[in-house]
């Protein structure tokens, strides 16, 4: 196991991010589970690689296997823009930290901690870290091509809560319950096609059972009064 001998979650998170970065290529993984809309499974990404969303999905899945809470985060250039990049935010012993498996980058703080999305938003710390690594690794490294906006976290979030009426209503409901939607980890079923399909089928089955129960109840009620 690539995390053998590591004693902290931050070390495990960093080594998994680095391993996924070096595992196969960076092109979009066109495999999928059952239907194309579900995208590739973490195992399919493990076998053939993938782009930022694909590799981030694999990192998050591997972290969950270690019991480390994590989720995908999307980066937006502006509040109403489309997402331009995907990476991972994970919980470690000091809070939350961001790792990016498409560029092999994390964001350490000067005091030995690591930075999460909330720490990076509204600052130049992400871009400063990028410039530092570009200088350290030299022109032969892939990171020289990383654009600054992929290290800018001002509008980063796990879900686009403004996408439609349903997501806005969900965000409002979470706020009423005392949760900050922007600080919630992305639900696992959005990252695992098999789990998403399983939950969808269970929901359909539950609706069928409920509908059957209602029909039978109405039928018995009608028979009682006829």
Residue ranges and their predicted role:
Residues 203-220:
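Alpha-helical transmembrane segments
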Residues 57-132:
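Hydrophobic/aromatic-rich core segments of domains that either
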Residues 1-3, 193, 221:
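Linear, non-domain "peripheral" regions
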Residues 1-50:
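Secondary-structure boundary elements
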Residues 105-183:
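Extracytoplasmic/lumenal ectodomains and periplasmic regions of secretory and membrane proteins
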Residues 183-205:
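Juxtamembrane/start-of-transmembrane alpha-helix segments at the extracytoplasmic/lumenal side
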Residues 53:
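Soluble catalytic regions of membrane-associated enzymes that act on cell-envelope
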Residues 220-226:
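Short, charged juxtamembrane terminal tails flanking transmembrane helices
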């Amino acid at each position: 196991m690539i995390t053998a001998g590591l004693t902290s979650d931050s070390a495990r998170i960093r080594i998994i991010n680095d391993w996924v970065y070096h595992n196969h290529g960076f092109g979009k993984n066109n495999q999928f589970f059952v239907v194309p809309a579900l995208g590739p499974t973490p195992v399919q990404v493990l076998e053939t690689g993938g782009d930022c969303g694909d590799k981030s999905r694999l990192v998050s899945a591997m972290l969950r296997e270690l019991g480390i809470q994590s989720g995908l985060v999307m980066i937006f250039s502006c509040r109403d823009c489309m997402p331009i990049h995907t990476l991972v935010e994970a919980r470690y012993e000091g809070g939350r930290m961001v790792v990016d498996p498409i560029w092999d980058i994390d964001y350490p703080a000067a005091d030995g901690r690591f930075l999460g999305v909330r720490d990076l938003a509204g600052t130049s710390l992400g871009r400063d870290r990028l410039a530092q690594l570009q200088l350290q690794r030299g022109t032969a490294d892939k990171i020289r091509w990383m654009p600054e906006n992929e290290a800018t976290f001002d509008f980063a979030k796990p879900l686009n809560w403004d996408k439609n009426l349903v997501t806005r209503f969900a965000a409002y409901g979470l706020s009423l319950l005392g949760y900050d939607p922007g600080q919630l980890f992305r639900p696992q079923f959005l990252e695992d096609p098999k789990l998403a399909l399983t939950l969808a089928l269970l929901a359909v089955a539950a609706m069928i059972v409920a509908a059957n129960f209602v029909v039978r109840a109405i039928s018995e009620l009608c028979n009682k009064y006829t």
